[in-house]
Amino acid sequence: PALAFGDLDVLGIGPIARKVSESFDAYWNHALAYPASALAGQAPDEQTVARLRARHDAFVAAQTDSDYLQALRNSSLSRQLQEGNIRLVWGKAEVVADAPEKLLAERDRSELHLSSLLAPYFRGLERELIIFSPYFVPGKEGVEFFGNLVKKGVHVRIVTNSLSSTDVPVVHAGYARHRRNLLRAGVELYEMNRQIATEQRGGMRTFTGSSKASLHAKSFVLDRRHVFIGSLNLDPRSVIENTE
């Protein structure tokens, strides 16, 4: 069966919304960006367009009564949107993002990596670190880093995918080889149970439309004072190669 990804989104208003827009524009207007027309070649004829539209309309119609859409309709967020009364949690927020220049720079230019912006928060940890990272590949340096945090008295808990729940087994292999050393260092590890899709929460299924679940959310909670929600995984490819 298809996997249902357990993800996490955040709704932000005010200055951070403008910052996200600025980051998007930086990529949209970058020299490496090019229009879709550069890939499409010649424009499709009317028959092709009509056929694609018919396929699209049929797909949309088939999803109208899906478990997923039904869950959205019944969600508290949906009700709040309909009532025009979204309950927000107010707090200080900051947008951090890789710059497009990262794509053109040498791989060892760590000052261009998003991880360098987050490093001060990790270095300042005093009590607790909770990590959700579906594609978690700490490497030897990561094992040492988390082990040192534990020695400093920081309670480190990491949630990632199990072999049965991951959609990228190769990445899981990169994590599994360090699992024993992480546990020996005092790190608490929790792996996603793909059968969690059948569990209920508040009368609504946590994952719908599939009998198998996979973790996809990326977030870090630091000392219960700071939270990072984004696209960054704790693995070398995400830190060095990707733009997050």
Label each region the model flagged.
Residues P1-E244:
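Charged, low-complexity intrinsically disordered terminal segments
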